[in-house]
């Protein structure tokens, strides 16, 4: 039995915490036992995660008393691997590793610049969620030999082409209308603004842009939306109707991978994405969707017009999309690769 201590200093439950949940739940419980070290009040404590929760004070990187407490826990529970995800828990985990002799693995979920390569190079292994993230780490001085890419996996049983709800029925739209969809937090980096502008300028008949998500850009986007743009806010039932989109767009200025694109393609929805970060790995250009030049409105307009007006091309991409995700981005693939990595440390 290989005992693992996951550490996560974040209090929220976003993309990286969701990935950690999926990995923990998917691990072979006859081979791996997981303890999950979290701050008191962490939203992960409320989730269905197949582990033993442990509360630590992870709010400061150099809390000596807490580090010693974690060291004691590691020795008592014969922890062999410490897995970290964020800045503070990454430093804590590395220090505990050096004191106790446990191996330490750092997962990098973002493509934003890192503060110091040293805090990564002291790990035994670094997991990058895309090759784009791996390349960015190397460019900042992280040792290539330490890095392994393990793509984030999506629930291909939950996100299927067989949608339970047609978004047209819910919104009172014509049954033959074309639905362009986006599911993303309304923040500047997701670049909804360029999508709204491109969609408005195309002004195609019987075509609607459905926007799922909320965030700080809500008011700004409300000011430029037209009657053919429908903003639904946050929805808990996205997987039920995602498959009824005719195409999905993610125009982010920066993206480590783009999990929303994976979920859409798992539902056999063709995608359009900006050619930045890991999006070029999440979309197979001209096979499951189209890439456009990052932050280039004309390039986005061309991609939108092409897919909106060409039903045969949409059907071709749709037929390829589901298989592409099942083969490369399933939870099972992510978990098996993680298990193999743990066993070879």
How would you label these PLM feature ranges?
Residues 98-131, 135:
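A conserved, positively charged/aromatic
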Residues 14-22, 178, 182-201, 216-219, ...:
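A conserved mid-protein helix/loop that constitutes part of the nucleotide-sugar donor-binding site
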Residues 160-173, 313:
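A short helix/loop element that forms part of the nucleotide-sugar donor recognition site in Leloir-type
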Residues 38, 270-273, 283:
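Short hydrophobic beta-strand element within catalytic cores of glycosyltransferases
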Residues 285-286, 290-297, 306-312:
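Conserved acidic donor-binding segment of nucleotide-sugar-dependent glycosyltransferases
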Residues 234, 253:
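Aromatic "clamp/platform" in nucleotide-sugar-dependent glycosyltransferases that forms part
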Residues 169, 299, 306, 313-328, ...:
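A short, well-ordered alpha-helix in the C-terminal region of glycosyltransferases
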Residues 6-66, 148, 217:
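N-terminal strand-loop element at the rim of the active site
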């Amino acid at each position: 039995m290989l005992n693992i201590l996951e550490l996560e200093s974040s209090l929220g439950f976003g993309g990286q915490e969701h990935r950690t949940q999926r990995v923990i739940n998917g691990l072979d419980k006859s081979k791996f036992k997981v303890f999950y070290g979290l701050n008191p009040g962490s939203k992960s404590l409320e989730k269905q995660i197949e582990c033993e929760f442990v509360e630590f004070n992870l709010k400061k990187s150099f809390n000596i008393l807490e580090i010693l407490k974690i060291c004691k826990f590691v020795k008592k529970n014969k922890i062999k691997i410490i897995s970290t995800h964020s800045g503070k828990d990454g430093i804590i985990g590395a220090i505990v590793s050096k004191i106790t002799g446990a191996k330490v693995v750092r997962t990098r979920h973002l493509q934003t610049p890192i503060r110091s390569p040293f805090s990564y190079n002291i790990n035994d292994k670094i997991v990058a969620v895309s090759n784009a993230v791996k390349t960015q780490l190397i460019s900042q001085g992280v040792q290539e030999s330490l890095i392994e890419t393990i793509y984030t996996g999506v629930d291909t049983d939950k996100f299927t082409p067989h949608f339970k709800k047609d978004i047209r029925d819910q919104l009172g739209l014509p049954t033959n209308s074309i639905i362009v969809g986006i599911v993303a937090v309304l923040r500047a980096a997701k670049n909804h603004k360029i999508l709204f502008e491109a969609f408005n300028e195309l002004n195609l008949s019987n075509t609607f842009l459905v926007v799922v998500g909320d965030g700080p850009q809500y008011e700004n986007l409300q000011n430029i939306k037209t009657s053919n743009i429908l903003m639904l806010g946050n929805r808990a039932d996205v997987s039920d109707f995602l498959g009824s989109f005719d195409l999905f767009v993610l125009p982010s200025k920066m993206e480590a991978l783009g999990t929303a694109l994976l979920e859409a393609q798992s539902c056999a929805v063709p995608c359009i994405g900006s050619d930045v970060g890991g999006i070029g790995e999440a979309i197979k250009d001209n096979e499951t969707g189209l890439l456009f030049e990052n932050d280039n409105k004309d390039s986005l307009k061309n991609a939108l017009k092409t897919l909106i007006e060409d039903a045969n091309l949409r059907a071709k991409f749709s037929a390829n999309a589901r298989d592409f995700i099942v083969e490369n981005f399933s939870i099972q693939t992510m978990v098996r690769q993680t298990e193999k990595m743990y066993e070879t440390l």
